[in-house]
């Protein structure tokens, strides 16, 4: 009797199992779309002007901007010996005229050249306008370019010369950063995805936490290559004052920042050539003390077309 009952139970379990399998087979699996996941959609679109779209880029296939802020003008006759002739440099009043200091300036030029040579997709920009002490003879940026050429581009691949340019209007740290980005746009018709700045290491915090922040660039996209200065203590004191000034006045449009502020009244033309920053230029015209709250062409979620 118990054997027959066990057999009936076993047959019942089998029947239930087959019924369950049949029900599962009738459930249709969702169709596969075979589509890759969608990329993040830009929330804001900024458009190039018709004039901007017609301009042929001077350089292509580039994405990194290497900036060397130019600090002085070399007035000597032999640019190849610029590091040896401190007396032939038109230095600002608060700069030391020692040989060690001018060697540091030439070192910055060389580092910039070597950094650009390491990356074939990099553009090197020497940035700096005219100096009061040098008069209207030459811009600081042009002087740096001449030193690099006279030193045969410091022995690196000569092709780096075709990717080296000047930005000849900047007069303070914020302008070095912003105007060099604008110069990159003029050359490549797009904005850089990475920025490398060469300077004294005591200035690193100002560039990272003040200047880039004021123009909406992510710190993670910036590399700062800093060197020691022969007048380290003196430079650190001046730098602390500069940081305090830019913290109060992020765009450096007031005299308390201490820059030369366009001494020859030669206004930069970037507001007319980089029209995708139109709203930002308008904001700067009011000489604001607060950071711009709008979006930039390089802001996350923005597409420039």
Regions inferred by a protein language model and the residue ranges of each:
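N-terminal signal-anchor transmembrane helix specifying type II single-pass membrane topology
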Residues: 2-32
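Generic recognition of cysteine residues
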Residues: 21-24, 182, 253, 287
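A structural signal for short, hydrophobic/glycine-enriched beta-strand patches
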Residues: 2, 27-247, 251-252, 292, ...
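A structured, mid-to-C-terminal "fold-capping" secondary-structure block
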Residues: 227-305
